[in-house]
């Protein structure tokens, strides 16, 4: 009961008490008058990260996507009409509370929402409690590098990026010299599977029975950090009414290097099998595994990476360049479906037997940003991506072996205001 009381105090009491506000604080920041070690026992903040998401689709078939998701490019589509849209659904509202116990240890609690839940509906982003060694709740998945994010206007990011938020139980600590941080977590398994248009394996969703296990080691220095992480998964699928499972695993290497002028270089490399649920351009599409001609389900191999560089021309004027790619493949598939039409002979929903399928998503952008005053950033960005597929097998009693690709271009713009 005492623990529940502490959580309630951390989240809500700071918003009800009258306290002193400080320069550079958020919309509402309050501190208790009682202190410990010259720090307030209780501190609370209410903040808003306002984001205007404007975009003009030049071509490529992503008119219905509010992010520049290369995985959603319809490679057999022909609609290259332009589209202009704006929204503020990516605006975030958060409440944060810090409570210092009598022994000097601090407890932090965060609740954060945005309006990206479909048609402007509110969506929970984060809700967690953190102590000196534990973090429990929903936050960034430990397989990804929480500190990384290229400074871009469109918030899908590179196709191989890992920016997944899941409920988890995480334990972390430091070695004696504090240069190395270790992290272990139990992550909620991902079970949202939606068939994508280009390929539709006859695999159904099944209840998961085990958490995803992650481990990470981070090396911190004044210039930035390097991080290595790994994941082990048990993924269950239902094939032809029968439940089966397989092991998935993956590894990432990531890091950031920054200078005193705030110029920075970021990168992330990823590879593994059965981890497509974590790759941003294909996450949630049920591509972790596929049925083979042997009647078994095999983990999907995939790999990718991205790099970004941000350069400050002046303290207020800066630019970013980002490149990234993702590659995954299905070998010796029992069957899959090509929707829309084949490149030469138009046939709707072609069933392909005993074949292979692979896809590459390539991504690049360049932007310029300006900060007219404190807490305000405006920018414009050119986004470009290519989705290519290779496929072969037997269709309509004939051998097919072909490939197709389609590119897309978007101009993103908007502002970010932190209140």
Segments (PLM) and residue ranges:
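Cleavable N-terminal export/targeting peptides
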Residues: 1-31
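Outer-membrane beta-barrel biogenesis signature
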Residues: 20-49, 53-69, 275-279, 317, ...
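Detector for outer-membrane/organellar transmembrane beta-barrel domains
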Residues: 219-358, 362
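Extracytoplasmic loops and strand-loop junctions of Gram-negative outer membrane beta-barrel proteins
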Residues: 28-31, 73-80, 151-155, 198-200, ...
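Outer-membrane beta-barrel proteins
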Residues: 57-61, 120, 145-149, 191-196, ...
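Outer-membrane beta-barrel "beta-signal"
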Residues: 403-419
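Outer membrane beta-barrel
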Residues: 37-66, 76-192, 209, 214-225, ...
């Amino acid at each position: 009961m005492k623990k529940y009381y502490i959580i309630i105090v951390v989240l809500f009491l700071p918003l009800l008490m009258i306290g002193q506000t400080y320069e550079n604080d958020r919309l509402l920041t309050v501190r208790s008058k009682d202190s410990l070690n010259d720090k307030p026992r209780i501190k609370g903040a209410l903040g808003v990260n306002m984001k205007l998401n404007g975009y003009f689709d030049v071509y490529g078939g992503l008119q219905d996507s509010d992010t520049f998701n290369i995985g959603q490019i319809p490679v057999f589509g022909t609609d290259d009409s332009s589209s202009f849209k704006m929204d503020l659904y990516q605006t975030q509202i958060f409440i944060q509370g810090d409570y210092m116990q009598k022994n000097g240890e601090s407890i932090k609690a965060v609740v954060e929402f945005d309006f990206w839940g479909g048609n402007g509906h509110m969506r929970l982003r984060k809700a967690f409690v953190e102590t000196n060694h534990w973090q429990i709740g929903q936050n960034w998945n430990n397989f990804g590098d929480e500190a990384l994010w290229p400074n871009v206007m469109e918030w899908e990011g590179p196709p191989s990026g890992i920016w997944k938020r899941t409920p988890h139980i995480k334990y972390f600590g430091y070695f004696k010299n504090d240069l190395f941080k270790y992290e272990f977590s139990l992550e909620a398994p991902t079970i949202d599977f939606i068939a994508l248009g280009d390929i539709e394996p006859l695999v159904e969703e099944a209840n998961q029975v085990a958490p995803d296990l992650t481990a990470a080691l981070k090396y911190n220095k004044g210039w930035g950090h390097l991080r290595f992480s790994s994941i082990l998964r048990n993924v269950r699928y239902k094939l032809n009414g029968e439940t089966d499972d397989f092991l998935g695993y993956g590894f990432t290497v990531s890091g950031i290097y920054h200078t005193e002028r705030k110029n920075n270089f970021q990168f992330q490399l990823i590879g593994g099998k059965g981890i497509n649920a974590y790759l941003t351009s294909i996450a949630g599409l049920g591509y972790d595994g596929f049925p083979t001609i042997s009647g078994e389900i095999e983990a999907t191999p995939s790999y990718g990476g991205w790099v970004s560089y941000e350069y400050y021309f002046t303290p207020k004027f800066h630019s970013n360049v980002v490149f990234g790619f993702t590659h995954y493949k299905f070998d010796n598939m029992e069957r899959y479906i090509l929707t829309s039409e084949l490149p030469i002979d138009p046939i709707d929903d072609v069933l392909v037997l005993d074949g292979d399928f692979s896809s590459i998503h390539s991504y690049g952008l360049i932007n310029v940003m300006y900060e007219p005053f404190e807490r305000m950033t405006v920018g414009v960005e050119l986004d470009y991506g290519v989705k290519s597929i290779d496929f072969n097998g037997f269709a309509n009693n004939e051998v097919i072996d072909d490939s197709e690709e389609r590119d897309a271009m978007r101009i993103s713009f908007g502002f970010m205001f932190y209140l």
